[in-house]
Structure formats: C-alpha cells, structure tokens
Amino acid sequence: MSNLPTKAKVVIIGGGIHGLSTAWKLSETYKNPGEIVVLEKKDTAAGASGIACGVVRNNYFQPAMRELMAHSVSVWESDPKAFKYNAVGYMQISPEIMHKDVASIYEQQKAIGYDSVFIEGEKDCSKYMKGIFDDWQAKGITSVLHEKKGGYAFNKDSIKALESKANSNGVNVHKGVKVTGFKRGSNSNAVTGVVTDKGTIECDQVVVGAGPWVRDFWNMLELPKTTEIKGQDGKMHEVDMWKYWFLQEGVLGVDANYLRTNEGKQPPVIHVDTDAPLHSDT
C-alpha cells in the first residue's frame, strides 16, 4: 500500500508474526479503517517468520508459557484452512536423563486441561511408537509425551493469512517503508510519532514487533545498552542488552506420502532426544 498516512492511532513496526498478529487483535478494538498502520521495510514474512519451522506445540517448561501456548494453539485451531494449519499433534520422545523434566511438563499440561498422554518405561514406549510406526526402532527411549493438539503450519502462508485478516479489519500494511527514528513530545520523552524514509506518522502508540532487528529500534530510542543479570555465583554481572544468535533451520523436500503412519495418515510432529548411538542404514 502506498500513500503513507500522516496520522494513526497505533503504528506497528514489523510485518512478521508478532507485528501482524498484534495488528489483527488490536483491530478488534480500533475498528475504524486506518487507525492501525503496519510498517514493513521489505515484505510480510520476509524475515524470521518466513523461515521458522512452523511447529505449533505446548512443550515448554515454564507454567506461564504453557498457559499462553494453550491459548495460542486455540487461535491456530480457529481457522486452520487460512493458516494452513495441520493439527497432527506433537510428540516429545526422550531418554531417561530427561524423564523427570518431561513428566513435569505433562503434569502441568494436565493441570490446565491440555489434551496429552504420557507413556513411561522403555517397553511401553516402544509398544506405543510401533502402534504408530511399525518399523520404529529407537533405543533407550523411556518417555513419550504425546500432545494430541498442536502440529504444524506452513510459515509464509500463515503470515499472509494474518495479513489478510488484519487488512479485512481495516489495518493498513505499508511495505517498502524503513523506520529511521522516532518523534518525541515537546515536554516529555514520550514517543509521538514514527519517522520513516517516506515521511513521519503522528501516533498515540507504537508497537515494535521487529524480531531480530529490535536492537536497532532500542538504540533509536536511546535505551540502555547493557543490563545486569545475576549469575550462578550469586553476583550481578553487566551484559549487553541484546545479543544476536543466528539459527539456521533446514527444510527438506520429501514425497507427500513419506513417513505415513500405520494407518496411512500424516504423522504427528516428532521431536526425538536420544543419548543412544546413531547408525546410518545406508
């Protein structure tokens, strides 16, 4: 969309999953067209959101995170066709060294009514997995946490669906617009506008949903470059506020019928941790 506006209620920076999901939900409050503006320097799903693995799961160790993820899974389930969401479930398959931690995750899932089953013991785990794949042969597995909800979504398609939902609610998404700074109030440090290479937008609120680029906006706002974190030694240590870790995820093209279950269905998303030796069969 061209013709950058000069005013908006909310300006959201970033056209990935954070920016667009925020725009979509805020559009339920700000219902007048043009009140919400999304700025994206390239294209929606051009950054990390477009290369993420797309797994939808609730396999997290923190209780608060688990409740949040249960809510998020329900959003994916609300429109699986648009989000290209495949509700095949998720499996955490682990050796004995992880048994206690995975059992804790299961108990927390059970406490919030999240549908999952937990299989314990090497013999029972092998039996359970062979009920899904009759050629299952992983050794040393003593726990299987099978989340019946969750699965996976196609990354770029799901982000484009968020863009479509936001657009339908009157959100304006402007692509090819680079944010270069912020405008402050005359008598305060409050941000009153977003400065771009295409002009300035006056606004009431700003949401920065820029993923790995958040550091740049942090610096534009002249916020602290370091913070203090308590170490294992009990002492406070000064560390950089932002540290960028580059994660690469590979995508393999396989036949659509590859790794089907015994019933010929799509398998759950499977995560296997193992301390057993790995051997090639080729």
Predicted regions and their residues:
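Conserved Rossmann-like nucleotide-cofactor binding loop
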Residues: 18, 44, 213
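Flavin-dependent oxidoreductases
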Residues: 21, 57, 182-190, 196-282
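Glycine-rich FAD pyrophosphate-binding loop
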Residues: 27-49
